Amino acid sequence: MEFTPPLQQGILLRRYKRFLADVQLSDGSEITLHCPNTGSMRNCLYPGETVWFSTSDNPKRKYAHTWELMTTPDAGLIGIHSGQANTLAEEAINKGIIKELTGYDSLSREVKYGDENSRIDILLQGAQKPACYIEVKSCTLLEDGQGYFPDAVSLRGQKHLRELMHMVSQGHRAVLLFVVQHSDIFSVAPAAHIDPEYAKLLKKAVLAGVEVLAYRCEMSPTEIHLAQACVVRV
């Protein structure tokens, strides 16, 4: 996915009220960005470092600028826009980058499924194949060289694991796909120290037949895309 128009940059001052962040531009002026990330963004905030943001020409938006990337102190990059994970996953599936998810005829987004009033991120269907239900999660939490998910207690994430297990019990294929938007994460594990129930459910889901995949993003201020598989430690 290319960033069009090109991203602009500034210096992070602060994130607050969950969905807002103030940055300083090169001329010394300050603007407020929309922060499209519902998580805690634990270990992803580096005041004084460079951020990259997009700008919308929609006059109805209260905040025209959206935070896209965060530069780390060691010159790495973090994808802040967690909502882009589904788009990145769809793009990678269509291009055949995710080898485990090739060979299907159709791809649908946000289809109702399960018995807990959920919508699946991606549904793949093909002739003479079980339907494949894919939940996509953005992973950005890095601690002691290990990537973790979630970065806060996630009741929604727990629900999605239950839904995936239900799909397997109905004879379908179910996949949990971690989209790694942190250049220094090379393996992903459940954050049992943050959400022990999620970690417990993930192990149960794997035993029930849910597949878990993780793919790293290649990121730059000009584009972002899924590039290669990485290790999942359940």
UniProtKB/Swiss-Prot annotation:
HAMAP family xref list: SfsA
Protein name: Sugar fermentation stimulation protein homolog
Segments forming a coiled coil: none
Family note: Belongs to the SfsA family.
Organism per entry: Shewanella baltica (strain OS185)
PANTHER family: SUGAR FERMENTATION STIMULATION PROTEIN A (PTHR30545:SF2)
Molecular-function GO term, any one: DNA binding
Entries under Gene3D superfamilies matching the protein: 2.40.50.580, 3.40.1350.60
